[in-house]
């Protein structure tokens, strides 16, 4: 009985290893670039060299923007606000999930404290 379990387990390991190597080969083939793609990549690098002298900057928080890409920081978004009947887009730091969780905990604790009084 134990021998049968060992044989089945070893066969399952062999199948798992074989299937993972096939998946790695498929992934490697998908990642290979064609000649046209590498030529266009080379042209793009030449364009970057030409425009490399231009300074690239980002918009700081609470200044006007058009796209999320223009704002500084990973968690900064270009969010729309309505002021005096017209829309203004400003860069705002959303802070990510951790900040939202901590804010939720802080609100919960303050509500519990206010209920105790």
UniProtKB/Swiss-Prot annotation:
<feature type="disulfide bond">
    <location>
        <begin position="65"/>
        <end position="78"/>
    </location>
</feature>
<feature type="disulfide bond">
    <location>
        <begin position="58"/>
        <end position="72"/>
    </location>
</feature>
<protein>
    <recommendedName>
        <fullName>Hainantoxin-XV-3</fullName>
    </recommendedName>
</protein>
<comment type="function">
    <text>Putative ion channel inhibitor.</text>
</comment>
<feature type="disulfide bond">
    <location>
        <begin position="69"/>
        <end position="115"/>
    </location>
</feature>
<feature type="region of interest" description="Disordered">
    <location>
        <begin position="20"/>
        <end position="55"/>
    </location>
</feature>
<keyword id="KW-0964">Secreted</keyword>
<feature type="compositionally biased region" description="Basic and acidic residues">
    <location>
        <begin position="23"/>
        <end position="55"/>
    </location>
</feature>
<keyword id="KW-0872">Ion channel impairing toxin</keyword>
<keyword id="KW-1015">Disulfide bond</keyword>
<comment type="similarity">
    <text>Belongs to the neurotoxin 03 (Tx2) family. 02 subfamily. HNTX-XV sub-subfamily.</text>
</comment>
<keyword id="KW-0800">Toxin</keyword>
<feature type="disulfide bond">
    <location>
        <begin position="71"/>
        <end position="91"/>
    </location>
</feature>
<dbReference type="GO" id="GO:0090729">
    <property type="term" value="F:toxin activity"/>
</dbReference>
<dbReference type="GO" id="GO:0099106">
    <property type="term" value="F:ion channel regulator activity"/>
</dbReference>
<feature type="signal peptide">
    <location>
        <begin position="1"/>
        <end position="20"/>
    </location>
</feature>
<keyword id="KW-0732">Signal</keyword>
<dbReference type="GO" id="GO:0005576">
    <property type="term" value="C:extracellular region"/>
</dbReference>
<feature type="propeptide">
    <location>
        <begin position="21"/>
        <end position="56"/>
    </location>
</feature>
<keyword id="KW-0960">Knottin</keyword>
